[in-house]
Structures are given as C-alpha cells and as structure tokens.
C-alpha cells in the first residue's frame, strides 16, 4: 500500500485538518511554510542529526529482553530504549526539532503544554540549549502528581504555569497554551508535545519522532538477520511515541501494530482514557480525531494512573490507522500497567515509565499468543524514575486494603 498521508489540507483519511480560529490560522500557515523550507534544506537535518547524536545520545539501543522473553516463554521481545535518551524519554526528539525550527523562524519565546512533565522537561531543556525564553503550561492536578518534573523545568530556566481551569489536567494545559499563543503569535512558537493539534503539528511531531522506527527497523535487521518483526507495541496517549515507531513500518503489511490505551479502572467505568475503544470522532484542539465525549458532544474527563496518557483524544493519524484497520488499539488497565512496571523492573533491571508499562503489560499477553517463533519490538518510551514514589504509594495502599479485607 502506498501511504501518502496527510493530504495538502492536513487530513489523514477523514481525520485531522485545521480547525482553528482566524487568529491562529496565520501562525499555523507560517509554521507549515517554515517546516516545508526546513524539509528542503539539508543543513537543517544535518544540524538536527548532529544534536540527536551528540546531545540526546542517539541512536538508542534495540535491546533483546532475553530474561523477559524466557520468563514468558513466548515471542522474542525487543525493547526500543527511548528511556535512555537525554531527559529520559522520547519527548526530546520532537522538542529539539521544534525548538531548532522556531530558532530558524526567528522566534524568541517557546511555550508548551505538559502532562507527565516529560514534554515540559524536554522543551525546557531544548530552550536552554538554544537560549530561548520558555513557559510551560501544566494542569494543577499534574503539578501535584509530578512535583519533581516541575522542579526540573524551573531548574532549566522555564516558568511553569499551573492551570486551574476544568479538570486541571493535560487538555486544560493545551487550552491555556493555545490561548497564550494567540496572544503572542509574533515572537512565540508553541511546541505541541504529541502528534495532535491542527495541521501541520501531527505531521511535524510524527516526522521528528519517526527516528524511533527508522532506527528500530535497521537495528532489528542487524541484530536478527531477519527483515521485519512480526509486531510492534507502543503506548498511546496523544500517540507520539507510537506514531514514531509505527510510521516507518506502515507499508510493511506483514507487521502487526498495537497501540495500548489507558483503560484506567476499566473501560466499562467512567475512569479511563481509552479513546479508540470508547470514543467517537469529534474536534478537539484544532483537529478532527476520536474523542471521549458524552451524548451532547461534551468532552469527558480522561483518567489514568499515568499522567502522560490521560488525554481524551488521540492523534488523527492513529484514528486513521484504526479506521483503515492498519493498527489495533487495545485497552490496558492501571492494575495491568502496575504489573508490567514491576515485572520489567524485577526481570530485566529496567524501571519503565508508567506510560511504557501499559505497552509492556500488553506485550506479555501478545508474546504468549504469538509463540516462540515470532518476535516483536516494544517501544520503551520513557524511564520510571518520575513514577517510583507514586507506584510505591499505590502498592502500599493496595497492600493495606488487602490486609483490611483479610482482617
């Protein structure tokens, strides 16, 4: 299949587009023009590649998780180690690319939204590197959950604005950042952290994150002597690490692609962020995509143990993959993610982010189904340092509840 998305209007099949007020249209058109110019300029990519090598530490390893594979007794599991990037997650791939683009556009200030804080830290890091002013918008609820990342951002010279609107999480931070961009368009670039928002953001983020899949494809060949893995697994919130892994394989039809959504307390409760499992198409933050909404089209609150996955929408390209059945999207509960978190830590000595733990949990199930002749690549999108205290508290609370139940 020849995959040519997006079209000139920013649509991936029937999803995507540019649903923004007139005040923002100038900015997104300016951004698209600058991005097309950078794509045509070899020096832009050369400079970015050099930074990715020398500053970020790419390429990241593709690691055969032998212990985990043997423990499960199924398909071979290879981990794409995005947790080993500078700042501890895949987010830096996009942040660095966009700050470099903004610098070339002559912008002076950077703004961004963040949920778990990883995109905020990555953006603040890139802004420090390029000596640019930086403000990060973060839902008040996430500020509490991720105090360590808030301090990191401030340490890197960024100003962190706690957003008190709505449910005080990621979608509210995006709203606040977009409002700020409208008011400061001339000298400010807004760095969206995931593969969503109005065109050209989903395409830009995908392109900067596709380094994950391009490296993994070549590394898999070098490691195994085989052409392609049988499956890919990555967690999806907005979906940037997943689209980065999936996109370079999209025309390889023999490769099954699985995105793991946050099922929270279960998809039959109101407490989840399983957008493709339970949502339907709607416009959010400038793009037509699958969205969690009620019968009246009001956006529902998303819920997940992982701050990076509780977004009520998903990038339009994922909605398109789902629509054309190129990828499958499966719900993984908080409890399953916690099991994945502990299992990888115990068996491989790698503490994954709670986001990535959703992918690990599903990979364990999939490995059993596929059997030992098959193999898969799992995107380990980030490291779990930021989540250790939260997991400790949660496991202690669960143990106390069990103790009370047995008393």
Swiss-Prot record:
Keywords: Amino-acid biosynthesis, Aromatic amino acid biosynthesis, Lyase, Pyridoxal phosphate, Tryptophan biosynthesis
Quaternary context: Tetramer of two alpha and two beta chains.
GO molecular function term, any single one: tryptophan synthase activity
Recorded metabolic or biological pathway in which this protein acts: Amino-acid biosynthesis; L-tryptophan biosynthesis; L-tryptophan from chorismate: step 5/5
Organism per entry: Streptococcus pneumoniae serotype 4 (strain ATCC BAA-334 / TIGR4)
Gene: trpB
Family according to the record: Belongs to the TrpB family.
Listed cofactors: pyridoxal 5'-phosphate
Gene Ontology cellular component annotations, sorted alphabetically: cytoplasm
Physiological role: The beta subunit is responsible for the synthesis of L-tryptophan from indole and L-serine.
EC code(s) of this entry: 4.2.1.20
Residue positions where N6-(pyridoxal phosphate)lysine is found in the record: 91
Lyase among keywords: yes
Protein name: Tryptophan synthase beta chain
Matches recorded under PROSITE patterns: TRP_SYNTHASE_BETA
